Amino acid sequence: EQLYPSQYVYKYPKAGEKNSEVRLYIYQIEEDKKVACDLGEETDIYIPRIRCNPFDNSLLVYRLNRLQNHLEFLRFDQQNGQSELLYEESNKAYIEIGDYFQFLKTRNAFLFTSEKSGYTHVYLFDGDSRKTVQLTKGNFDITDLNGVDETHQYLYYTSSEESSMERNPYRIGLNGEGKTLLCPEAGWHDVQYSRGFQYFMDRYSYLNHPALYAIRNSSGELIRVLKDNHALINKMKEYELSSMELIQVPNEAGDQ
């Protein structure tokens, strides 16, 4: 907003100084009072995420230790501030906090991402059974969560499963079954779903082809091509440009 850079000052402890202690409160508007949340005896912690559960009006809080290698999901009762441990994971080195998190509207459950398998995957926590189910599995990363169709019990996502140099959209049941590749064309797909997930727009491109825009149904079947950039393709042919190609170089271990 400013034309010139300005100095930003924030508290950061110097060596030997005590870290700031994090406290969490729930403010009850009707009763005009605040309820202290019990974060445990350890005060040298982070609270990287706070979520409000619309299903039971509780508070879900991420608690992360100072070393950032032990993460816990805590449920707080808004009346008394008491906590319940729902989920936890540990790592010898570091835990990356994922930004994707979604409560389901029709059941007491939520979706979140984790790298605990070595890759970014989607997990479902069931609030009734207190069990966590891994929905997506494999040696690839989930790169985008496109939405949840609770009516038909599907999760829509984009991943690098076909190739680390490509992005393809998929859908999978909320029970972890019935995975379907929606757009098999090699390249990069950027999708946007309609309300109700009946259709989606696919913006698709690859190295030697400009962006193509198309409408597909929820199963990935092509409904209509909106723009194929045919004129641009013909124009590019006039310049007789060399074709581009991506290659993978293996190392001694065979990794690429």
Model regions and ranges:
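Structural motif
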Residues: 21-23, 68-75, 118-123, 164-170, ...
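Short loop/turn segments that connect beta-strands within beta-propeller blades
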Residues: 28-32, 77-81, 126-130, 173-177, ...
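Beta-propeller fold detector
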Residues: 35-38, 83-88, 132-137, 180-184, ...
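Short flexible coil/turn linkers enriched for glycine and charged/polar residues
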Residues: 67, 116, 163-164, 176, ...
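N-terminal cap/lid segment of alpha/beta-hydrolase-fold proteins
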Residues: 227-256
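Structured, non-catalytic alpha/beta "coupling" segments that mediate domain-domain communication
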Residues: 70-72, 199-226
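Predominantly five- to eight-bladed beta-propeller fold
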Residues: 1-36, 219-234
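Conserved beta-propeller blade repeats
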Residues: 9-23, 38-64, 70-75, 85-113, ...
